[in-house]
Curated annotation (Swiss-Prot):
Pathway annotation: Amino-acid biosynthesis; L-lysine biosynthesis via DAP pathway; LL-2,6-diaminopimelate from (S)-tetrahydrodipicolinate (succinylase route): step 1/3
Cited PROSITE patterns: HEXAPEP_TRANSFERASES (PS00101)
Keywords: Acyltransferase, Amino-acid biosynthesis, Cytoplasm, Diaminopimelate biosynthesis, Lysine biosynthesis, Repeat, Transferase
GO molecular function: 2,3,4,5-tetrahydropyridine-2,6-dicarboxylate N-succinyltransferase activity; nucleotidyltransferase activity
Source organism of the structure: Acidovorax sp. (strain JS42)
Enzyme class: transferase
Protein name: 2,3,4,5-tetrahydropyridine-2,6-dicarboxylate N-succinyltransferase
InterPro entries to which the protein is assigned, alphabetical: DapD_Trfase_Hexpep_rpt_fam, Hexapep, Hexapep_transf_CS, THP_succinylTrfase_dom1, THP_succinylTrfase_N_sf, Trimer_LpxA-like_sf
Chief localisation class: cytoplasm
Amino acid sequence: MTQQLQTLIDNAWDNRASLSPSAAPKEVVDAVEHVIAELNNGRLRVATREGVGQWTVHQWIKKAVLLSFRLKDNELMKAGDLGFFDKVPTKFAHLSADEMAATGVRVVPPAVARRGSFIAKGAILMPSYVNIGAYVDEGTMVDTWATVGSCAQVGKNVHLSGGVGLGGVLEPLQANPTIIEDNCFIGARSEVVEGVIVEENSVISMGVYIGQSTPIYDRTTGEITYGRVPAGSVVVSGNLPKDGGRYSMYAAIIVKKVDAKTRSTTSLNDLLRD
């Protein structure tokens, strides 16, 4: 079934220029809708973890997310007195109180999660935004004004502090999703984008910006890497000298490995998760 679905989506993607809400084969519409529904329920995800820092990205699922925009017209959506005009409904709009309780998720107004995202049991959405295709795992808090971009993958027991931004894949078009692994703490107003992977148990200080072109400098080893924060790292914003010291350029600095002191200042509060 999955292979047939993948083949159908791949073929539709190759012929996407010919698709529209009024001109698309029913089998393509049904296939795309099936993928979105499975993403919404957490049975499919854009990327799956094989090990620490090792992920397999399912490009065909990302293609289905993009095709869903091609196949739908905007429509009027209401939330109380507020009106919206969009192609993607919100995730929780039509759930009853019992259905919401069964999800095990706490959603603080005016948090928004789009249909096609998955929010696991024990997660908390403060007034924040979770885009289509994103996956937020158990026990994670998405704090106020944080944004989980399209198809971003967030692990278990992660804290995304206020104003954090995780980049999406839809625009500008990115090959791989941004990934935050289990037990990470992302400090306020930090941005992780362009498919960067933050490996498990890492702490990103507030105001750190990491993209694929950002040098990640380990002050202990002197090594510079790109696109990946090693497991258990504590990262702050900084600069590296360039051109013989004539000027410096921004870098993310690994200052140490996570220790007991770090854990004591970034631990999750179980009282908030009752």
